[in-house]
Each structure stands twice: as structure tokens, then as C-alpha cells.
């Protein structure tokens, strides 16, 4: 059966097209339309299967009820989990999420922002990369709510939600030191983004505070997006040539690759060799022995991001930007 048009619904309900439009766009109570009429029209809408054209609706109301989510890599477990949480929370508030990955390519990131603009999204949730400052500044100048998360852009005054990467990393290295470890390695990636640089800074600070010399040869910086086999070759060389007694992997996918290398080389995790992964993963709990991991507060990050962007969307005046840092915790296994 062909679904009804907005005109058909108005005729069937015995009301004007304008009244039906107000009800569909959530403005019925602002226009003092009675509850009886609202329920009558809503019943006809449900029974007819009527679905408003989203683009036409956004042109009429100025709102699309769509939020754009831009992340580094949606296949990464951290981003996929947080995207799902954001999507669920947004849906409960009447918003849909469309998302895509930058893969840390600045041109792709700029193209995504342009694409989301053409989709008339109401706001943006972005895990940014350097070089996007002007684009994000322009979004805010256009009165579009923008929430940055996971990594910040220090030169940009914008809303930001993230975990305390420095403190979580410091505590991880400190836990190694308290176990008597002296040759502590950091396996990280070579991209200049806030959360990665903070982990390296915290690593160096913890060593210095406990009078352990920083040795550059104990830090492996893996190229972002390089083939896993090449990464594993680099890790194997590091583990075999240095007398390492502990290693912090700066991401969970690096840790998973590292566990494969340790298995291949026969290096045992235990009293003589300890491992911590940044960002927890199901693999670490299932592994024998269990792998300690830094757990970011994904639920709190998602909830805070949604609360911030919804408050921005509903406010008739510009709100002050907020920087919210949430604690991460070390899960010892």
C-alpha cells in the first residue's frame, strides 16, 4: 500500500497541513495543539507508515537530527566501541549518527567535513588531527556545535572530552618500577597526536622520577598504518636485542601484535617479563596469563560527549566551551 503524504494525513485527521507539519517536527506543544489532536495525527502516521523526507524536513526546520562523527579508524576497537555507545545514546535523544574514518589523512578529514556539511548535520563529534584547526574553527563560526574527543587541538578553543592519558601511563610505568623492573620498553606509534605524545611524555617522567635513565633504544615508534608483519619484525628485533623486563604497548592493536611476537619467540610473560596494554581488549582477559591493561572510561566519555552536544544544540545562546578530563584506570591481571 502506498504510504500517505502529509496532505493525505491532514485530510484524514481533519486538520490543516500546517498542524500536521508542527506535529511531525515536534513543535505541536509550542503551538498549543491539543493532546487529542496530536495523538490522532500520530496514530494515523504510525498506521500509514509515513516517513518524512529528511532533506526536505531539514530545509523546513533547519534541523536534520543527524550528528556527524569523525574518528581515526572505525575498525579500531576503541573507536568502534565508543561509536556504538554514542550512537545508542544519541538515538534515545532522537538523533541519528553518521560516521567515517580519517585514517589520520588530513585531506580525507577535510573532505569528510565538507560531506557532512552537505548532509546538513546539526553538529560534529570529532577525534581530530593536526591541520583541521581552521576547518573546525569555521564550523564553530557557523554556529555548529563541535565536540572534540580522545585527542585535543591545543591551539583551538573548543569543547573537549578525553581521558587522562598522562596519569594512566605514569601509573602503568610506576607499577612496573614497583615490581623491580629497570629495562622498561615503550612500543608506540609515530604520529603527532595528543594522546600518543602524552603517553611518551609520561613514560619519560616516570622513569626520571624514579632515577631510571631514559634509553631511546627501548622506545619503538611504529609507522601508523604499516603492515602488521613489518611491525612484528621490528618488535622481534627489539625484544631479542635488548634486555627488556617490561613493555608498555601504547595501543591495544600494538599489544595484540606484540603478544604474537612473544609467542613466536618463546618469551614468557611472568615474573621476569611484564606487559601492559593501553586500551583494554577482550583478548587480554582471555590470554594466559591475563594481560594488564589501561581501561578508558568509554561509557562516561560517550555520555559526556552526548550531553555536551545536546546542550549546545538546545541552547539559544552560545555556551562556554568545556574541557573535561576523565580518569582512566589500570586493570591488573
Identify the function of each model-found stretch:
Residues 1-62:
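N-terminal helix-turn-helix DNA-binding module of bacterial transcription factors
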Residues 126-171, 178, 191, 253, ...:
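Flexible loop/hinge segments that line or gate small-molecule binding clefts
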Residues 232-333:
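Flexible loop/turn connectors
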Residues 88-133:
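Central regulatory/effector-binding core of bacterial HTH transcription factors
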Residues 2-5, 45-78, 82-84, 93, ...:
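N-terminal helix-turn-helix/winged-helix DNA-binding helices
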Residues 17-22, 59-73, 183-190:
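Short beta-strand segments enriched in small/hydrophobic residues
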Residues 183, 214-218, 268-275:
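Short acidic capping loops at alpha-helix termini that bridge into adjacent secondary structure
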Residues 71-80, 100-108, 161-171, 187-234, ...:
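Hinge/beta->alpha junction and helix N-cap segments in small-molecule ligand-binding domains
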Amino acid at each position: 500500500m502506498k504510504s500517505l503524504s502529509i496532505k493525505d494525513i491532514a485530510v484524514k485527521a481533519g486538520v490543516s497541513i500546517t498542524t500536521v507539519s508542527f506535529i511531525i517536527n515536534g513543535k505541536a506543544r509550542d503551538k498549543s495543539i491539543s493532546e487529542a489532536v496530536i495523538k490522532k495525527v500520530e496514530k494515523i502516521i504510525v498506521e500509514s507508515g509515513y516517513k518524512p523526507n529528511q532533506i526536505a524536513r531539514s530545509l523546513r526546520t533547519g534541523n536534520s537530527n543527524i550528528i556527524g562523527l569523525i574518528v581515526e579508524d572505525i575498525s579500531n576497537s576503541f573507536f568502534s566501541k565508543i561509536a556504538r555507545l554514542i550512537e545508542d545514546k544519541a538515538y534515545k535523544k532522537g538523533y541519528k549518527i553518521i560516521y567515517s574514518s580519517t585514517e589520520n589523512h588530513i585531506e580525507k578529514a577535510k573532505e569528510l567535513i565538507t560531506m557532512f556539511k552537505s548532509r546538513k548535520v546539526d553538529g560534529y563529534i570529532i577525534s581530530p588531527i593536526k591541520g583541521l584547526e581552521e576547518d573546525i574553527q569555521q564550523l564553530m563560526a557557523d554556529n555548529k556545535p563541535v565536540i572534540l574527543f580522545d585527542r585535543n587541538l591545543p591551539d583551538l578553543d573548543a569543547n573537549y572530552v578525553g581521558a587522562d592519558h598522562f596519569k594512566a601511563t605514569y601509573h602503568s610505568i610506576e607499577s612496573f618500577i614497583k615490581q623491580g623492573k629497570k629495562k622498561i620498553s615503550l612500543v608506540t606509534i609515530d604520529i603527532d597526536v595528543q594522546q600518543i605524545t602524552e603517553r611518551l611524555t609520561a613514560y619519560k617522567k616516570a622513569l626520571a622520577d624514579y632515577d631510571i635513565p631514559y634509553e631511546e633504544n627501548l622506545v619503538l615508534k611504529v609507522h601508523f598504518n604499516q603492515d602488521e608483519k613489518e611491525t612484528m619484525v621490528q618488535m622481534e628485533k627489539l625484544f631479542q636485542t635488548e634486555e627488556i623486563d617490561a613493555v608498555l604497548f601504547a595501543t591495544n592493536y600494538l599489544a595484540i601484535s606484540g603478544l604474537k611476537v612473544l609467542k613466536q619467540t618463546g618469551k614468557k610473560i611472568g615474573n621476569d617479563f611484564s606487559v601492559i596494554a593501553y586500551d583494554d581488549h577482550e583478548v587480554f582477559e582471555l590470554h594466559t596469563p591475563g594481560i594488564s591493561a589501561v581501561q578508558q572510561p568509554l561509557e562516561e566519555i560517550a555520555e559526556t560527549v552526548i550531553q555536551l552536544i545536546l546542550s549546545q544544540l538546545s541552547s539559544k545562546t552560545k555556551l562556554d566551551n568545556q574541557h573535561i578530563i576523565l580518569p582512566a584506570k589500570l586493570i591488573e591481571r
